[in-house]
Structures are given as structure tokens and as C-alpha cells.
UniProtKB/Swiss-Prot annotation:
Gene from which this protein is expressed: rsmH
EC assignment: 2.1.1.199
Purpose of the protein: Specifically methylates the N4 position of cytidine in position 1402 (C1402) of 16S rRNA.
The protein's name in its UniProt record: Ribosomal RNA small subunit methyltransferase H
Gene Ontology molecular function terms on file: rRNA (cytosine-N4-)-methyltransferase activity
UniProt source species: Streptococcus mutans serotype c (strain ATCC 700610 / UA159)
Any one of the GO BP annotations: rRNA base methylation
Amino acid sequence: MTNDFHHITVLLHETIDMLDIKPDGIYVDATLGGAGHSECLLSKLGKEGHLYCFDQDQKAIDNAKIRLQQYVKTGQVSFIKDNFRHLKSRLADEGIYEIDGICYDLGVSSPQLDERERGFSYKKDAPLDMRMNQDAQLTAFDVVNTYDYRDLVRLFFKYGEDKFSKQIARKIESARKEKLIETTAELAEIIKSAKPAKELKKKGHPAKQIFQAIRIEVNDELGAAEESLTQALDLLALNGRIAVITFHSLEDRLTKQLFKEVTTLDVPKGLPFVPENLQPKFSLVNRKPILPNARELSENNRAHSAKLRVIQKIRN
């Protein structure tokens, strides 16, 4: 693996074990990233099995081709440079209309966070960017400097869940009248200045939630996740599974709600029996999310907020 794309995979074995891999199955890693999940999954596939890997970051794909070269040589893995919201159409391009399993590791990958010039981190000064796909148009700079006060407040409340959203939006509006806000450090300082002193003493960086909100907006992360998960449910073969790792409450809420909708019986009360065609087609594999164990938490700080949810198709 190349040294500049180091990534510790979260909930690695739990995720792949929960997919219940069939050696000759067709699988998808919707979020290739550092290729940890892909490598583990491929090790369980036979010669007839195949894995399709999605990522919109060319660096991630280039790295994965090196890390997974033994499977590239045997033709067991394919790479698709695209947003996973195009899951169904891009798999159709490959002649795939049904899959046995798919895994998602949502959010931004560690290498993207660590690469200063990508502008994801409030800890490293860099131009405001935050694009997972470097070919995309909208950047964090655009959001911070062109969104009006109301849109910023809506964004910070909805995606950042920050109770000081109004104060922060006002500070941004005021600061950019003097000069454009160009770097992550500038933005982080403006956010800090908008919060009361007692708030700054609390654990965690004061800019964390706002940076998350801007990142979600720039990449339409929740919209893409909902579209992709809905398509994944349609693509699943009988007994196929979807495994989703989330890192914040917004992603987890979306996943939990979507899974609940397709696993809950929706019939009139008082019905003496439920016909087969009205029974849910899906079932939760784990009622409660799977969390990292103590060892993983001690080795990987990023794992602290991780949750794994898994669903299975039980009827056609």
C-alpha cells in the first residue's frame, strides 16, 4: 500500500462476517477508501466470485489497485470511479442486476482528512475545499462565501445540529464583508469567536459540527446515501445482505429509518392472518447496532462513533 494513503479500517471483520460471504457471490464495496473491507472480502471469494468497488476519489482507486493487485490479476475485482448514488446504473453497465451483498463505510475517509490540501480538517490550515470528488463544482469556499444567512443557519442546524448556528452564520456573514473567507483556519477562528467562552471549554473542537455540516452539503452525503441504499435494497438477491457503518447521528438515523421501513409489517389492524405477499421482504440481522470492541477503540480513535447495521433479504 502506498504510504500516503494510510487508512485503518473500522469494524473490519465484523462487517465482512456479517455479509456471510458466498465464495461464488457478486459483491459491492460502495466506499472503497483504503480498501480494507475490499481486501478482507476478496480473501473469502473463490475464482467465480467478483467484487465491484466504488469510489469517486481517483487516488483511492489507484492505491487499491496496488493493494489488491493479486485480485486484479485474477480478474476478481473491478473499480468504478463514481458516486455510489449511481450504483444501479453503473452496475447495469457491467451487466450486473443482482448482488449478494454490499458494504458501506459512510463519511469521509482518513486519508482525505489527513491530506491537508483537501480542506476537510479544522486542525490543518488549507484552502476551503472538502470535495470528495475533485471534479465536482461546489466547494466549501462557495458555501461559506455565497450562501446567505438563512441558508447557512438551515445548513448548520440540519447537518451540524449546532445550537449556536445563528450566531455562527452572523459571524460568517460579517467576516466575509471585510474579505472572503479562504482557509480552514480562518473559518475555524470565526466559528470559535461566535461561541461563548464556557462553550469553548467543553470537550471537542468548537468547529467540528459546522465543518461536518459544510462537508455534508458540499458532497450531498445524506442524499447520496439514501439514494444508494434504496437502490441496494432493490439489487439484493434472496438472502443477500447490506452492511452499513455510520459515524454520526444523521447517517445512523437515515440508515435506521430506511431499514425500519422495509422490515416493518404494514397491514390493517385486526387482520386474522398476514398473506405472504404482504410480509416484509427484509429482516434486520442485528436488532441493535454492532459497536467496536475495547481493543479497536484503544487502537483507532476514529472508531469511537462507529455503528454497524445489517439487513437481509428474506423474501422475493
